[in-house]
Swiss-Prot record:
Residues 103-124, 479-488, 598-626 have a biased composition (Polar residues). This is Probable protein S-acyltransferase 19. It comes from Arabidopsis thaliana (Mouse-ear cress). It is a multi-pass membrane protein. The DHHC domain is required for palmitoyltransferase activity. Pfam families: DHHC.
Length: 718
């Protein structure tokens, strides 16, 4: 159950003890301490000093316990609970809507055309929710009772520097898998409160609440005032005990006059002595804790960072520093060693994991390191699951770290900060979220991109076209069948949608094909451009034109398996040109699969700057149209070259063997399309034949190792 504050039931036993002791000591002071100091004047002075101090302790304790230190990313959960199921969505609902939106965009391009008018709908929704929460807060401020309660529950004020630092932390936000929400960089999930705490310091059992950014200053003030309160209590108690044993007759008379005949000198001395002893016993640990936090503030670290650093020092080998990096061993994706060990942490921290087949599903356990495995390779005969079960059965619980101001004084704050950073990096609860903002931007661009595809499908038998896109697109079908929309399919889905983005404007299709660093195998660009351009000036398209658009669009979809993602370049409003980056295929250990990374952008930008220059003959084969429809004729002096031969196609291909990346090169495939005439029976027949080949024919495994072929990036081949 998610706890909102420390007053929420069930109460911790330490919290009950703290409240009980405060009440007993306060009553004892007014009944047994102040009246017996000696004289009315001293009594009034001590009551005047003690009363405001005790009141401040009470207010600060109530305030520090009542403040909700949760991260702002999960505050919507509490706001919705307060409104009794109102219309404020939780972070989980927003995340679910985000995933459902991505799945709808992936499966139905026509849906995206309706949402293209609001490309940042998910972002606007979250902003709208935050505005509704702020509006509810503003309305509650006009309630007089809310103003009185605000003294106890309103969070601590922060300086401008801390606010700027807080804004900077949003750039490196994390995603909590337990809260299912985006949290700030220095937040941590408290398992006692079951929520992420903003700038987590520690969970105080005496308050039954977490101490974080929102109530840390109140916590420090509470300790300081409590020390003063205990000092007054203990000092006055010692003075009264001295009078009991020094002025016995006078004290007996005062006890009878003020408390009645039921109290004698012995019981009175016992009560005063116990209360004084309790005050002194509480004074020393509280003073050490206050001094400890003063050192933390001076060093600029938190209690959590201190605990992590001390635990790392206790578990580190003798003579090793806590900031030493364990060597990060690189593993082959096809090697057997990946079944036992992984260096999946972003900072090179090894943590326990178990690879599944295929190596995309990875299960890790927070703050655990494999004790039975060395950083070297292990044989494939080792069963990590069996070893893990045996280890969990004999697992020794972590020893609690004692709060020591002396150890903190000798601790290097930089080492503590690095140790805490490693702990966050190796956590299975908090994950980095850098790519999440990028995914939101990409999703916005995809909405506008797919809407064009939807409009084309409406004009040219949209039902058939959308069905062909889903059937002939191996990338989208693979993502839809293998990954969840929120994790594994982002890179692949990005490739598919950006390939369709070249159809966003008919006048840009020709430019995109010309600027592509990879060769084009057909002349779909001109025919699609001409068909789209002539649509506004002619009657509706006939059946032959529909068939031509379907075939050319299928060929465009087939090309995206061999093309990189398009890069949008700054351009004037009249003409938006799209550039293409060359990519390299590398193995991502954290994702457990191959990903495409940009190699360079200089070549596409160079081609973009020289697009008005004469096009070489090697590229004319990609842009010439043997059958232009509605396109103005070109001069014979423009250097029209015949289509390249089969040998020239093979020389320009990225890879020469069969590839696992969606069909591989289109070479040595027999021409079986006899229904088309001679003008289109060259490369178009080969492209059409590739689309009709089964998946097993395009993705062939090696007969000896039963593995799919692996290829190195182009930059490494000579």
């Amino acid at each position: 159950m998610v706890r909102k504050h420390g007053w929420q039931l069930p109460a911790h036993k330490f919290q009950v003890v703290a409240i009980t002791v405060f009440c007993l000591l306060s009553v004892a002071y007014y009944a047994f301490f102040a009246p017996f100091v000696g004289g009315r004047i001293w009594e009034y002075i001590l009551l005047g000093v003690y009363s405001p101090v005790a009141l401040i302790v009470f207010v600060l304790y109530v305030r520090c316990t009542a403040i909700n230190p949760a991260d702002p990313g999960i505050m919507s959960k509490f706001e919705r609970g307060a409104s009794r199921g109102g219309d404020l969505p939780t972070a989980k609902d927003i995340s679910r809507k985000f995933d459902e939106t991505g799945s709808h965009l992936q499966s139905s391009p026509s849906v995206a055309s309706r949402t293209s008018t609001l490309p940042n709908s998910s972002v606007k929704g979250s902003v709208g929710d935050a505005q509704r929460v702020e509006a509810a807060k503003r309305k509650s401020c006009f309630n007089p009772l809310a103003i009185c309660c605000g003294v106890f529950v309103y969070e601590d004020c922060r300086s401008k520097e801390e606010t700027d630092e807080q804004q900077g932390d949003r750039e490196e936000a994390l995603f909590c898998t337990l809260c299912n929400a985006e949290v700030r960089k220095f937040s941590k999930h408290c398992r006692s409160c079951d929520k992420c705490v903003d700038c987590f310091d520690h969970h105080c059992r005496w308050l039954n609440n977490c101490v974080g950014r929102k109530n840390y200053m109140t916590f420090i003030s509470l300790m300081a005032v409590s020390l003063l309160w205990l000092l007054i209590e203990a000092g006055v108690g010692i003075a009264v005990i001295v009078r009991v044993f020094v002025n016995k007759k006078d004290m007996e008379t005062e006890i009878v006059n003020r408390l009645g005949n039921g109290f004698s000198r012995a019981p009175f001395a016992t009560v005063v002595g116990l209360c004084t002893a309790v005050s002194m016993l509480a004074l020393f640990p509280l003073g050490e804790l206050f001094f400890f936090h003063m050192l933390l503030i001076k060093k600029g670290i938190t209690t959590y960072e201190y605990v992590v650093a001390m635990r790392a020092m206790s578990e580190a080998p003798a003579g090793a520093s806590i900031d030493e990096e364990i060597p990060n061993v690189l593993y082959s994706p096809s090697g057997s060693a990946t079944t036992g060990f992984s260096g999946g942490s972003s900072l090179g921290l090894p943590y326990k994991g178990a690879w599944c087949t295929p190596p995309r599903v990875f299960v890790d356990y927070q703050d655990e390191v494999i004790p039975h495995l060395d950083p070297r390779m292990v044989p494939s005969t080792v069963d990590p699951d069996a070893a893990e079960t045996a280890e969990r059965g004999n697992k020794i619980p972590k020893r609690p770290v004692k709060i020591s101001a002396w150890k903190l004084a000798k601790l290097n704050s930089n080492e503590a900060t690095r140790a805490a950073a490693r702990a966050r990096a190796s956590s299975s609860v908090l994950r980095p979220i850098e790519n999440r903002h990028l995914h939101d931007d990409e999703l916005s661009s995809r909405s506008g991109t797919i809407s064009v595809v939807s409009s084309v499908s409406t004009e040219a038998n949209g039902a058939t076209l959308s069905r062909e896109i889903r059937n002939n697109d191996p990338m989208l079908s693979h993502c839809r069948n293998s990954y969840a929309p929120s994790q594994g399919s982002r890179d692949e889905y990005d490739t598919g949608t950006h390939s369709m983005s070249s159809l966003s404007s008919p006048s840009h299709v020709h430019e995109t094909v010309t600027l592509s660093p990879l060769p084009q195998h057909h002349t779909a660009g001109h025919r699609f451009t001409a068909a789209a351009a002539s649509n506004s000036s002619r009657p509706p398209l006939n059946q032959a034109t529909n068939h031509m658009i379907h075939s050319t669009f299928d060929e465009k979809i087939m090309q995206k398996g061999n093309h990189a993602d398009p890069l949008l370049l700054p351009a004037p409003a009249a003409s938006l040109l799209r550039d293409v980056r060359r990519t390299s295929v590398v193995w991502d250990q954290e994702a457990g699969r191959y990903i495409s990374v940009p190699a360079t952008t200089s070549e596409p930008r160079t081609r973009f700057s020289s697009q008005n220059q004469p096009i070489p003959s090697s590229h004319m084969g990609n842009t010439q149209n043997p059958r232009p429809v509605g396109h103005p004729p070109q001069d014979s002096s423009s250097g029209r070259a015949p289509p390249p031969t089969q040998q020239q196609q093979g020389e320009r291909l990225m890879y020469t063997g069969e590839s696992i990346f969606f069909g591989g090169p289109l070479v040595n495939i027999p021409n079986r399309d006899g229904l088309r005439h001679d003008g289109d029976s060259g490369r178009e027949g080969q492209d059409r034949m590739t689309l009709t080949l089964p998946r097993e024919a395009r993705f062939k495994r090696d007969t000896t190792s039963n593995q799919l072929p692996v290829f190195a990036p182009v930059g490494t081949r000579k």
